[in-house]
Amino acid sequence: NIVLNELDWWIASQWENMPTRKNREYARSDNGVIDKSQKYEMLRKSSALKECYIVRYADDFKIFCRKRSDAVKLFAATRDWLKERLGLDISPEKSRIVNLKRQYSDFLGFKLRAVRKGVKSNGTAKYAVESHMSDKAVKKVKRQTREMVKRIQSPANVNEEYKAIGAYNAYVSGVHNYYRCATHISKDIRKIAFGITRTMQNR
């Protein structure tokens, strides 16, 4: 993780932290967050820089770009930088370029894509992130909750029943807390709950 912090800094230096002649960053009065929107707009208009942002957890990361051509160049540059600077090879099986307007991309148990949400003032399409639990995560949660329900319905004794109920409640609460930031988590949870309800009714 400490080693890959250098990757974070390098990617940020390509766009987010690129210095400009005039400081166009300011702290918002409502929440104190540093707003770089004016800086980014200026860079888009007056430079040929490739707009990119990195999201990373441990050694799993995504780099987001506006255009496929930028993504192709940045993919190659990042692969070479990791090899030359840190002596690391990327996984050919896990590393690829994805068009989020056409398909989902999985990351840390979520699946993400960009969906059209109206039009900007300049007439171009406006996009927003749509996120769900990943298909793999849904299958895992279904499997584990079914197993927990079975333990509740067939306990060895009352004490074991209380333990099973407590474990089930803690697990469900943990799933809700982890995935609550997904934009469509309610829809995903309803599908899982429907399957679990059927399991309970059939036993």
Residue map of PLM features:
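Non-catalytic terminal/accessory segments
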Residues: 1-203
